[in-house]
Amino acid sequence: MRVGFTPREGLVLYNVTYQDGDEARPIFYRASLAEMTVPYGDPAPHHYRKNAFDVGEYGIGSLANSLTLGCDCLGVIHYFDGFITNSRGEVAKIENAICLHEEDFGILWKHMDWRTEQTEVRRSRRLVISFIATVGNYEYGFYWYFYQDGTIQYEVKLTGVVSTAAVMPGKVPKYGTLVAPQLNAPIHQHIFNVRMDMNIDGANNSVYEVDIVPEEDDKNPYGNAFYAKSTLLPTEQAAKRLIDPMKGRYWKIVNPSKTNAMGYPTAYKLMPGDNTLAMARPDASVSKRAAYMSQHLWVTPYHEDEKFPAGDYPNQNPGGSGLPLWTASDRTVEDTDIVVWYTFAHSHSPRAEDWPVMPVATIGFMLKPLNFFDENPANDVPPSPKNHGSKHACCA
């Protein structure tokens, strides 16, 4: 893995692999936060225009904090500095912009044999790579987590100070919440898009949508049957998709040329976390400028000039750039070098407890191996020593 940093995106990861025995197996070539839009839901003249593009307009990397040991990151830390150009065209260094460390994350796996009462437990340790940016009033923490079983997680932590405006005495705002006398915190959304140049066991991949569905009645005499239904998404238009939690929907990124010991194509599955739809109408200015918000999943063939879902220059752009423009030609995304774009949204209806500084809220997604391995790759994790002075391993 290589850790990178750009003024626009902040933290960028390259060449992420899993060391499977003697083989470093590729998972993705490049991954970053590609865009982030914050549309406000109050139609008042001084609020409806608040639609910040924190990546494309502000450059979230250039707003990265210098992280502090024991506060922003805890434990044995390795820091990376970030380098940007300032308004005079000079190179400026952001010290300790990126933090890398390991942390305990509870039980990795466990089993007790009830016959012998012998127990095996392994603790999970995850690798954390993160940075934090201050965009005006808000703070955002961006975290990549790498687990011993091959799972990859992306998480955003939202905190800071909510945007507010004064209201007349006695008015109860419809499009927000009073957080102090005559002080309204308007409702809004934080909508993120992460770009992942996939590389599952090689460059040529395909994407399938998977829904958990009941079996048809004529094949289901006892009424209990259900299965995971996979549908190939062969083109860009077919791959414009929404989440469906009622069906347990996820998407699997497959290498059709590689199989595991059971004959399944090696894959990773993209598992949505908390998510919602963008609330702005399609004819709203922000919906045109940030049209990537209309879909949770986009898939495109790799092109070196296609990096930002709202286009290269979203500032005052009337719309039509980025993913809607690229996908209009409906290129094939089957068994080729693909880029997966995942959109996830946090709807923030402020509450009194968000004032004066908001406790952290989290949102994100996971990438989990799906028949990528022949068995649990964390079986070889050694037992942990007990923490009570014993020289013996814990529960082994």
Can you say where each PLM-predicted feature lies in the sequence?
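Extended effector regions of multi-domain proteins
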Residues: 1-151, 157, 161-173, 177-396
